[in-house]
Amino acid sequence: LTSVDAGGDAAKQLQQVETFISQKVDAIIMQPQEQEACSPAIDKAKAAGIPIINCNSLTITEPDAYVGSNDSESAEIAMTYIAKQLGGKGNVLMMHGHPGQTAEVKRTEGAMDILAQNPDMTLLDEQTADWDRAEAMTLMENWIQAYGDQINAVFCQNDEMALGALNALVQAGKKDNVLVVGVDAIDDALQSVKDGKMDATGYQDCKGQAEGAIEAAYK
C-alpha cells in the first residue's frame, strides 16, 4: 500500500493520481479534495483501466465505487440538536470546511435545511476555517468581537473547528452562553463532551470507511 497526502490541494491530488497511473498500480483509493476539481482523476484512472474508489468524499464524475457517510444527515442531526437546545429560537454561526469538498457542500445543505424549518433561528454568519483548529479559533475570536452576546450557538462542520471555536469562547469567557457542536466524533471532541465543555458531536466511522474502501479495491 502506497499512501500520499494532497494537503487539501486538488491540483496536487490530480498529479498524484497521474503518478499512480504511470506506475500501473492495481487500484487507486482517493479522498477527493474537491467535487469538481478532482473529477478528472476519475476519468484518467478509468481511461487507464485502473479501478478508482472514492473514500469519504464524492466527485461529480462517478468512480468505480464509493465508501462514505451521509454528510447531509450528520449536519441535520447536529443542527436539530442545536434547534432543540435553543427552543427553536436563536442566533447561530456556521463554520465551513474546505469549499467545494463533498463534506462541506453536503453538511451545509443539511444544516440549511434544518434552519429553514426553524424560522425563528437566524444564521448570523458563515465562513470557512478549512477544517483547521487554529483557523477556527481565529475566526471565532473575530466573531466574538463582531457579534458578542448575540451568539447562541456555533455549528462547526468538523470537530477540529469546533475545538478551535471552543477554545476561543472559553478564553473570552463566553462559553457558558454558547452551544458548540461539531461532526466526526474524534477522540479530542469526545473527551471534551465528556468533560462538559463541547456540547455535542456527530459520529462518523472513519475507520469503517477506510476498511470498506480497501475491501472495494480488492474486489
Predicted regions and their residues:
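A residue-level marker of the well-folded mature domains of exported/periplasmic proteins
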Residues: L1-K219
